[in-house]
């Protein structure tokens, strides 16, 4: 099968690999029908994910059809349409029992797919702990509607939940990339008094204004002043930092009112400074974290009910054997791209040389 592979820092390559097989009785093999590229894939490419293993197939956003299941898998069966959770989790350790599946203590727990074990930018993927890592897609929900459930939408859902948003709050979201917009969709469910999105890209700012007219939009240069003008207590009650740029961490806590909650959703390429003398007296509560993907079934129900729709984010589609072009467009933010879908079962004829060690 074709599989997009992490070779070394700065280099991914499309290679031929064997179709994965069941290794554990709790595994499932999924035929990938639709996948996507995430900014975390770019972090691997750029060397910002030290745990990433060279030689693995990248990709952790995907939906597909179950092909095989291990003897102990009971929740799914061959032929089922499923979302694949970005997190691998046992469901039994201290953290899993408390809903913190990102911190699963299993050796392959947490973010493993497409990082430490083979992921889904391929024709097939092996999913450990399939009873927990796969969720049924309702018949009325398309692959496109379900595509982002297992990662960026689950990230936004988790971030909105831990941010303790109330209906009286002014909420600032920094960043209107794919994860930022997914976060926005989940914050909208909380019905806060006011939502402000800070985004430097004119195209993405325009997207937010057109799609979500009830949301206020600011640019980074004027964000603090904009927030002060549009909040009641000297800043935002809740700030969600989803951009991960060089200056956005400071912008996040700088725009927060005293005693606010600042939730760090972004993954940074470089260490960030925590200038405690400057922050003294603001009494901020910081929350950090990658996705704890334990809400996928609830998210799928919300999609089925028409309360969440991420399909406008999918601006481009490519067959798997054109994934290099898909990455070029996504990484360089060309052609108004927000999210790229990779069609795993649609492959244009091409000859790929097998890898020789």
Model-derived segments and their meaning:
Residues 1, 200, 250-254, 293-357:
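C-terminal hydrophobic helical "lid"/dimerization subdomain
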Residues 20-35, 48-97, 138-141:
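Glycine-rich beta-strand-centered segment in the early N-terminal region that forms part
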Residues 38, 75, 85-135, 139:
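Cysteine-cluster motifs in flexible loop/terminal segments that predominantly coordinate metals
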Residues 75-78, 167, 258:
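Short, flexible surface segments
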Residues 79, 168, 214, 235-236, ...:
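Local beta-strand N-terminus motif with an aromatic residue
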Residues 139-221:
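Mid-domain Rossmann-like dinucleotide-binding core that forms the NAD(H)/NADP(H) cofactor-binding site
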Residues 163, 188, 205-285, 347-352:
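Glycine-rich cofactor phosphate-binding loops and adjacent beta1-alpha1 units
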Residues 199, 266, 290:
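Conserved acidic E/D residue at the C-terminus of a beta-strand in Rossmann-like folds
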């Amino acid at each position: 099968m074709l599989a997009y592979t992490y070779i070394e820092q700065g280099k991914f390559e499309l290679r031929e690999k064997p179709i994965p097989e069941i290794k554990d009785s709790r595994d499932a093999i999924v035929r990938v029908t639709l996948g996507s590229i995430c900014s975390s894939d770019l972090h691997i490419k750029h060397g910002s994910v030290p745990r990433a293993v060279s030689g693995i197939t990248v990709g952790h956003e995907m939906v597909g059809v179950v092909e095989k299941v291990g003897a102990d898998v009971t929740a799914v069966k061959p032929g089922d349409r499923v979302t694949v959770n970005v997190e691998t989790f046992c469901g039994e350790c201290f953290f899993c029992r408390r809903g913190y599946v990102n911190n699963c203590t299993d050796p392959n727990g947490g973010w493993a797919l497409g990082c430490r074990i083979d992921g889904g930018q391929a024709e097939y993927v092996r999913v450990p702990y399939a009873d927990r890592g796969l969720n049924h897609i309702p018949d009325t929900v398309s692959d496109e509607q379900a595509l982002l459930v297992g990662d960026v939408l689950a990230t936004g859902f988790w971030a909105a939940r831990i941010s303790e948003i109330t209906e009286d709050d002014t909420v600032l979201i920094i960043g209107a990339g794919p994860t930022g917009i997914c976060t926005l969709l989940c914050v909208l469910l909380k019905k806060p008094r006011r939502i402000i999105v800070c985004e430097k890209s004119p195209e993405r700012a325009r997207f937010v204004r057109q799609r979500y007219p009830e949301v206020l939009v600011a640019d980074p240069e004027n964000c603090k002043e904009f927030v002060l003008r549009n909040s009641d207590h000297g800043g935002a009650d809740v700030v969600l930092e989803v951009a991960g740029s060089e200056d956005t961490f400071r912008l996040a806590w700088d725009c927060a009112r005293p005693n606010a909650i600042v939730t760090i959703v972004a993954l940074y390429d470089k260490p960030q400074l925590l200038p405690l003398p400057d922050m003294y007296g603001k009494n901020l509560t910081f929350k950090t974290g990658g996705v704890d993907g334990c809400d996928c079934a609830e998210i799928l129900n919300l999609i089925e009910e028409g309360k969440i729709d991420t399909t406008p984010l999918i601006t481009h589609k490519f067959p798997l054997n054109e994934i290099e072009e898909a990455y070029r467009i996504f990484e360089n933010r060309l052609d108004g791209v927000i999210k790229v879908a990779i069609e795993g079962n649609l492959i244009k004829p091409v000859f790929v040389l097998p890898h020789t060690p």
